[in-house]
Regions:
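C-terminal motif of bacterial Sec signal peptides marking the signal peptidase cleavage site
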Residues: 19-22
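Bacterial signal peptide processing site
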Residues: 24-26
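Hinge/cleft segment of the Venus flytrap/periplasmic-binding protein
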Residues: 34, 173-174, 185, 189-192, ...
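Extracytoplasmic "Venus flytrap"
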Residues: 37-56, 60-64, 70-84, 88, ...
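Short, solvent-exposed amphipathic alpha-helices that sit
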Residues: 49-63, 145-149, 173-193, 207, ...
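Hydrophobic alpha-helical segments within soluble ligand-binding/sensing domains
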Residues: 83, 138-163, 177, 206-209, ...
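Hydrophobic alpha-helical
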Residues: 91, 97-116, 182, 201-262
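Flexible loop/hinge segments that line or gate small-molecule binding clefts
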Residues: 105-144, 152-155, 162, 255-265, ...
Length: 317
């Protein structure tokens, strides 16, 4: 009898230890119904493009429920070092998923490797990295969008003349791809167009204005500009307006904002290639959610573009 009691006592202790250890090893993230923490890191919190990404993500989070969305962005304009620090913070805070719009194709790749090592799903938004350390990538087909801008631009300037180009950041995959697409198409269909200057504004409107003013001053016979992001587009549009050249200097830009709508309406901007940043944020959250729930997702998603002019401006109002 005593032996039986000892066996029962031993089994009771063993069962208790098993329960304690199993509870200790279980975290919030182990339960499919536990609240999840998603971190969204964009290039800045100034351009309407990134605010649209944020709005899309917020709306999807509300729809899904039980998700905390943390929005992070450098205080000023693009800062890859600050983005890296924010991503490392998200890893340390045990984020369940990270959505990242990398401002530098190379500089953000090392932290992407850390995210992968931490077994955290990484969804790239808008821009690429130089490695394959991500789970999904939602973006415009930027090279094709650049080609579309080139076709539009060539028609506006009748296939000839001097032009300037203003991008945001030289190391951003979006600027690289859009510039490549634009220049390739121009060489193909309008070889008499001469690119006299390619400059970078860091997406800052005031800097883009100064750059465009200098280019027009140095080239009085300039026929137009191509700009590959919202900040550059608005800065160049303001320079064209300030110099009274909206009838002689054609501008084809990128992105949608209240400022681009006004520039289309006042004639300083002739066309803008409009992306779908809201969809990037909205679908990005859904993809992260699906990955966490064991579902397969498409790795590359083209979120599409439209060329908007004064004639079809209602589609972005």
């Amino acid at each position: 009898m005593r032996k039986l009691n000892l066996i029962i006592s031993f089994l009771t202790i063993l069962l208790a230890l098993t329960l304690i250890l199993s509870c200790k090893g279980k975290t919030k993230s182990d339960s499919p119904n536990a609240s999840k923490k998603f971190v969204l890191i964009t290039m800045d919190s100034i351009d309407e493009h990134w605010l649209s990404v944020k709005k899309g993500a917020e709306d999807k989070v509300k729809e899904l429920g039980n998700i905390e969305l943390i929005f992070r962005a450098p205080a000023g304009k693009t800062d890859p070092n600050e983005q890296t620090r924010m991503a490392e913070d998200a890893i340390n805070q045990k984020a369940d998923a990270i959505l990242l719009a990398p401002s530098d194709i190379a500089a953000l790749s090392p932290v992407a490797a850390k995210i992968k090592e931490a077994n955290i799903p990484l969804i790239l938004i808008d821009s690429a990295i130089s490695t394959e350390d991500y789970d999904a990538f939602l973006s415009t087909d930027n090279e094709a969008a650049g080609e579309l801008a080139g076709e539009t631009f060539a028609k506006l300037v009748n296939g000839k003349g001097k032009i300037g180009i203003v991008h945001a950041q030289p190391a951003a995959s979006t600027a690289i791809a859009r510039g490549k697409g634009f220049e390739t198409k121009i060489k193909e269909i309008a070889p008499d167009i001469k690119i006299v200057s390619v400059q970078y504004s860091d997406g800052d409107k005031a800097r883009a204005l100064n750059i465009a003013t200098d280019i027009m001053t140095a080239n009085p016979d300039l026929v137009g500009f191509f700009t590959s992001n919202e900040g550059s587009t608005i800065g160049v549009a303001r320079a064209i307006e300030d110099m009274g050249k909206k009838d002689t200097v054609m501008l084809v830009g990128f992105d949608k904002s209240q400022d681009t709508i006004r520039a289309l309406e006042n004639g300083t901007l002739k066309a803008t290639v409009v992306q779908n940043p809201y969809k990037m944020g909205f679908d990005g959250v859904q993809m992260a959610f699906d990955i966490l729930n064991g579902k397969k997702v498409e790795r590359l998603i083209d979120t599409g573009v439209n060329v908007v002019t004064l004639e079809n401006i209602d589609i972005i109002k």
